[in-house]
Amino acid sequence: MTKSELIERIVTHQGQLSSKDVELAIKTMLEQMSQALATGDRIEIRGFGSFSLHYRAPRVGRNPKTGQSVRLDGKFVPHFKPGKELRDRVNEDES
């Protein structure tokens, strides 16, 4: 699902909200979440999951075109851990 598809679904289910209002709310929420992660904060949405940063240590990688070894610096990457309710719901839908 894309961001625009999410906006359409919310507008369809919440008829009293305009498309512009929903778009602004989603953009604001995503911007706030991005800022929180950028400052090292953890985000927890109960029943859905949590977002945090995981550190990837420096390592030696390979350039896929040349096969030459390349040193890669350590970095932080966003990580999502689904909550129990989300895991249960996903597994329930597969049955």
From Swiss-Prot:
Region (Disordered): 59-95
GO-annotated cellular components: chromosome; cytosol
Basic and acidic residues compositional bias, start-end: 72-95
GO molecular function, one term: DNA binding
One example of a Gene Ontology biological process annotation: regulation of translation
Keywords: DNA recombination, DNA-binding, Transcription, Transcription regulation, Translation regulation
InterPro entries on file: Hist_DNA-bd, Histone-like_DNA-bd_CS, IHF-like_DNA-bd_dom_sf, IHF_beta
PROSITE patterns given in the database record: HISTONE_LIKE
Complex formation: Heterodimer of an alpha and a beta chain.
NCBIfam families on file: hip (TIGR00988), PRK00199.1 (NF001222)
Job of this protein: This protein is one of the two subunits of integration host factor, a specific DNA-binding protein that functions in genetic recombination as well as in transcriptional and translational control.
Similarity field: Belongs to the bacterial histone-like protein family.
Protein's UniProt name: Integration host factor subunit beta
Gene name as annotated: ihfB
